[in-house]
Amino acid sequence: MAVLWGDAETGPHGAMTRFVPRFDAGIHTHANDARIVVIKGAYLYKDDAGEKRVGPGDFISIPGGTKHWSGGDENEGALFYNEMAGKFDLIPVM
Protein backbone atom coordinates (compact mmCIF):
# COMPACT_ATOMS: atom_id res chain seq x y z
CA MET A 1 0.00 0.00 0.00
CA ALA A 2 1.41 3.38 -1.04
CA VAL A 3 -0.31 6.20 0.84
CA LEU A 4 -0.94 9.23 -1.41
CA TRP A 5 -2.53 11.53 1.17
CA GLY A 6 -3.43 11.42 4.86
CA ASP A 7 -2.09 8.85 7.32
CA ALA A 8 -3.39 5.26 7.12
CA GLU A 9 -2.31 4.60 10.72
CA THR A 10 -4.26 7.47 12.29
CA GLY A 11 -7.08 8.71 10.08
CA PRO A 12 -8.58 9.37 6.68
CA HIS A 13 -6.31 8.55 3.74
CA GLY A 14 -6.05 7.54 0.11
CA ALA A 15 -3.64 4.87 -1.12
CA MET A 16 -2.69 2.80 -4.14
CA THR A 17 -2.88 -0.91 -3.35
CA ARG A 18 -1.90 -3.98 -5.36
CA PHE A 19 -3.36 -7.46 -4.96
CA VAL A 20 -1.20 -10.14 -6.57
CA PRO A 21 -3.00 -12.71 -8.74
CA ARG A 22 -5.25 -14.95 -6.63
CA PHE A 23 -4.74 -12.80 -3.51
CA ASP A 24 -7.31 -13.73 -0.84
CA ALA A 25 -7.98 -11.22 1.95
CA GLY A 26 -10.40 -13.60 3.66
CA ILE A 27 -13.73 -12.58 5.15
CA HIS A 28 -13.35 -9.34 7.07
CA THR A 29 -14.77 -5.92 7.90
CA HIS A 30 -13.39 -2.40 8.20
CA ALA A 31 -14.46 0.07 10.88
CA ASN A 32 -14.66 2.89 8.32
CA ASP A 33 -16.21 3.36 4.90
CA ALA A 34 -13.97 2.45 1.95
CA ARG A 35 -14.18 3.64 -1.65
CA ILE A 36 -12.24 1.79 -4.33
CA VAL A 37 -11.47 2.63 -7.96
CA VAL A 38 -9.77 -0.12 -9.98
CA ILE A 39 -6.87 0.96 -12.21
CA LYS A 40 -5.74 -2.41 -13.64
CA GLY A 41 -6.81 -6.04 -13.37
CA ALA A 42 -9.91 -6.94 -11.36
CA TYR A 43 -10.84 -6.48 -7.71
CA LEU A 44 -13.04 -9.38 -6.67
CA TYR A 45 -15.65 -8.64 -4.00
CA LYS A 46 -18.28 -10.74 -2.27
CA ASP A 47 -20.81 -9.86 0.43
CA ASP A 48 -24.27 -11.07 1.46
CA ALA A 49 -25.76 -9.44 -1.66
CA GLY A 50 -23.54 -11.44 -4.04
CA GLU A 51 -20.28 -11.30 -5.99
CA LYS A 52 -18.81 -8.45 -8.04
CA ARG A 53 -15.89 -8.29 -10.42
CA VAL A 54 -14.75 -4.67 -10.36
CA GLY A 55 -12.65 -3.79 -13.41
CA PRO A 56 -10.57 -0.81 -14.60
CA GLY A 57 -12.41 2.47 -14.19
CA ASP A 58 -15.10 0.89 -12.01
CA PHE A 59 -15.94 2.09 -8.51
CA ILE A 60 -17.21 0.29 -5.41
CA SER A 61 -18.20 1.73 -2.05
CA ILE A 62 -18.01 -0.50 1.04
CA PRO A 63 -19.78 0.85 4.14
CA GLY A 64 -17.87 0.43 7.40
CA GLY A 65 -18.87 -2.73 9.26
CA THR A 66 -19.87 -4.63 6.10
CA LYS A 67 -18.76 -8.27 6.27
CA HIS A 68 -17.12 -9.08 2.94
CA TRP A 69 -14.41 -11.01 1.10
CA SER A 70 -12.01 -9.43 -1.37
CA GLY A 71 -9.25 -10.67 -3.61
CA GLY A 72 -7.36 -10.31 -6.86
CA ASP A 73 -8.12 -11.65 -10.31
CA GLU A 74 -6.47 -15.01 -11.04
CA ASN A 75 -4.40 -13.66 -13.96
CA GLU A 76 -3.57 -10.00 -13.28
CA GLY A 77 -4.48 -9.42 -9.66
CA ALA A 78 -5.66 -5.86 -9.08
CA LEU A 79 -4.19 -2.38 -8.83
CA PHE A 80 -6.60 0.05 -7.20
CA TYR A 81 -6.99 3.35 -5.41
CA ASN A 82 -8.48 2.88 -1.93
CA GLU A 83 -9.84 5.80 0.07
CA MET A 84 -10.93 5.29 3.67
CA ALA A 85 -12.86 7.65 5.95
CA GLY A 86 -10.63 6.72 8.91
CA LYS A 87 -7.49 4.72 9.70
CA PHE A 88 -6.87 1.47 7.86
CA ASP A 89 -7.93 -1.70 9.58
CA LEU A 90 -8.81 -5.21 8.50
CA ILE A 91 -10.88 -7.06 11.09
CA PRO A 92 -11.03 -10.82 10.34
CA VAL A 93 -14.43 -12.49 10.68
CA MET A 94 -14.36 -16.08 11.89
Question: What role is predicted for each listed range?
Answer:
Residues 64-89:
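Ligand-binding loop in jelly-roll beta-barrel domains
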Residues 7-9, 43, 47-67:
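Short acidic-glycine-tyrosine-enriched beta hairpin
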Residues 1-26:
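A short glycine-rich, His/Asp/Glu-containing loop-to-beta-strand
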Residues 25-27, 45-46, 67-74:
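Short beta-strand His + acidic residue motifs that chelate non-heme Fe in jelly-roll/DSBH
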Residues 20-23, 30-49:
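Glycine- and acidic-residue-biased ligand/ion/polar-headgroup-sensing regions
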Residues 10-14, 31-33, 75:
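Extracytoplasmic
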Residues 3, 14-18, 35, 51, ...:
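Conserved hydrophobic/aromatic beta-strand scaffold that supports enzyme active sites
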Residues 91-94:
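Short, charged, solvent-exposed linker or helix-capping segments at domain edges/interfaces
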